[in-house]
Regions:
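Post-transcriptional modification and biogenesis factors for structured RNAs
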Residues: 1-182
Length: 182
């Protein structure tokens, strides 16, 4: 399953637009602590009203990502240029508040970080979502089971697992790495 997770959105219009995008690119919509009633997003959701009704609301980022296989977070200038990132079929996307993005703590729940290369480092939330959801949708790479790296977390700690995850290794690279470590 892949989802787009929006943390503390401030503008209802953006959630309506993101519901429409999710309908087009086959993402589930998850929202963490919205600053408004989601019903306010109806006008921009157009024909994605059912997607909007099925939007899941969470109290914490941890709850929103716990059942997802691979989560990519966004931060201007941090991580990998989204054009060069190898999105996989199980990649979920997490975006932050319109005014300030994701916090450092929230980024810790991400397996990888990407940024969108642009002349100005701030995009509208729904516009950023559209670029990343299209790039993920366009990907033909099979998903990598990130849970296979749990051995590394148990043996060497969460930081090493996070470092390896953020490198976005292929299945073959994970197989090779696990073979060397065991």
């Amino acid at each position: 399953m892949k989802a787009v997770i929006i943390v503390e959105p401030e503008q209802p219009e953006n959630i309506g637009f993101i519901a429409r995008l999710s309908e087009n690119f086959n993402f589930k919509v998850r929202v963490v602590r919205p600053k408004f009633n989601l019903k306010e997003s109806r006008t921009t959701a157009n024909n994605a009203q059912e997607k909007l009704r099925n939007t899941e609301i969470f109290e914490t980022v941890e709850e929103a990502v716990k059942d997802l296989e691979f989560v990519v977070g966004t931060k201007p200038g941090k991580g990998v240029n989204s054009k060069n990132f190898e999105f996989r079929e199980n990649t979920s996307i997490m975006l932050g508040r319109e005014s300030s993005g994701l916090t450092k703590e929230e980024l810790n729940y991400c397996d990888a970080l990407v940024y969108i290369d642009a002349d100005y480092n701030s995009l509208n939330l729904s516009h950023a979502a559209s670029i990343l959801m299209y790039e993920a949708y366009d990907s033909k790479e099979p998903g990598v089971d990130n849970s296979r790296l749990n051995f590394i977390e148990e043996e060497y700690g969460p930081r090493l697992k996070q470092l390896i995850s953020r490198a976005n290794p292929t299945k073959e690279e994970i197989d090779r790495l696990l073979g060397e470590l065991k």
